[in-house]
């Protein structure tokens, strides 16, 4: 099939219908995620693929709620996966610019909740924890961004358990953060604060769906992506899933002319497991990947 013919075969209406069908709710190892995998199984089957499903063990973490107040005023915050819960942590709040978090003295931050800038990132939390901080609150953009605060790639091993942070973490909006910084300055640099977070971290079975269009030999090209999502996740990553389905629909009628197979592999455990699903699947299929996988195209946030 010529490139122009492939483009002409793309059905934009069908693509959007697939996105809507996949967006059954926030997909974080819950019923909405199961529904999305059921939808994908039907879509790939209808496209003409051979479909299989697996469940692999993986460690995931979901934020369940957070509350934060400083100087008697409550602020809307989000907490983050792979951080500990905190039940009413009370401490003085101080502001440390993010470019000083690695050089701040223990005297400045020890026993305090630190307000700082940017996305909730593990290296920043680690630097402040090492200096004795009791918790960290990040000032993000106008919208509060979901982030996973971990350097552990995939599920933990005995060697990486110590790499998780040990203090609670939350984020608030840029507007609230700017106003809070002004209040801190007016108060002489500190305010009494209280931080509560609830994070559920657990081992679970991570679903993976594989849809294949068989070519003539055992070598294959992969198209991969994650199904789990923060919120409805239309862009991240129902769009990528829908494009995989549409590509399968276009390629399936050409199977008899294909030398190599095309394998579509979609998993959970990406956003809330820091790649636990993809890591577990690659471990389980390592020998086959090593011998026969020629190329992987990861479809994530397409159309953004």
Model-inferred region functions:
Residues 14-17, 21, 35, 39-46, ...:
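Extracytoplasmic/secreted proteins, especially bacterial periplasmic and envelope-associated proteins
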Residues 125-134, 151-158, 281-288:
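Mature extracellular/periplasmic domains of secretome proteins
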Residues 123, 205-208, 229-304:
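Acidic/histidine-rich catalytic neighborhood of metal-dependent amide-processing enzymes
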Residues 29, 57-59, 100-101, 119-122, ...:
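Solvent-exposed loop/turn segments at secondary-structure junctions
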Residues 98-148:
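A conserved hydrophobic secondary-structure block that centers on an alpha-helix together
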Residues 2-13, 17-110:
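Noncatalytic luminal/extracellular "stalk/propeptide" segments of secretory-pathway proteins
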Residues 53, 113-116, 135-138, 169-171, ...:
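Structural recognition of the beta-strand scaffold that forms the well-ordered cores
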Residues 73-106, 156-236, 246-261, 283:
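Soluble metallo-hydrolase cores and metallopeptidase-like ectodomains found primarily
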């Amino acid at each position: 099939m010529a490139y122009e013919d492939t483009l002409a075969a793309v059905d934009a209406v069908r693509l959007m219908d697939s996105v809507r069908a996949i967006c059954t709710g926030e997909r974080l190892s819950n019923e909405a995620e199961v529904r999305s995998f059921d939808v994908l199984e039907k879509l790939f089957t209808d496209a003409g693929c051979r479909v299989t499903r697996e469940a692999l063990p993986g460690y995931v973490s979901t934020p369940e709620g957070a509350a934060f107040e400083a100087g008697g005023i409550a602020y809307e915050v989000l907490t983050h996966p792979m951080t500990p819960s905190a039940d009413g942590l009370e401490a003085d709040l101080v502001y440390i610019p993010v470019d000083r978090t690695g050089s701040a003295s223990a005297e400045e931050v020890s026993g305090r909740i630190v307000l700082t800038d940017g996305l909730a990132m593990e290296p920043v939390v680690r630097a402040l924890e090492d200096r004795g901080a009791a918790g960290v609150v990040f000032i993000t953009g106008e919208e509060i961004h979901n982030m996973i605060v971990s350097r552990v790639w995939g599920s933990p091993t005995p060697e990486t358990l110590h790499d998780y942070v040990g203090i609670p973490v939350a984020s608030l909006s840029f507007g609230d953060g700017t106003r809070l910084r002004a209040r801190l300055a007016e108060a002489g640099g500190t305010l009494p604060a209280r931080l509560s977070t609830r994070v559920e971290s657990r081992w679970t079975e991570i679903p993976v769906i594989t849809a294949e269009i068989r070519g003539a030999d055992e070598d294959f090209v992969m198209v991969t992506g994650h199904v789990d999502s923060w919120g409805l996740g239309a862009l991240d990553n129902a769009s990528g899933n829908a494009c995989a389905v549409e590509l399968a629909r276009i390629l399936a009628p050409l199977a008899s002319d294909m030398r190599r197979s095309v394998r579509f592999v979609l998993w959970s455990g990406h956003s809330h497991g820091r790649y636990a699903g993809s890591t577990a699947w690659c471990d389980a299929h390592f020998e086959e990947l090593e011998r026969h996988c020629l190329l992987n195209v990861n479809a994530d946030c397409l159309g953004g």
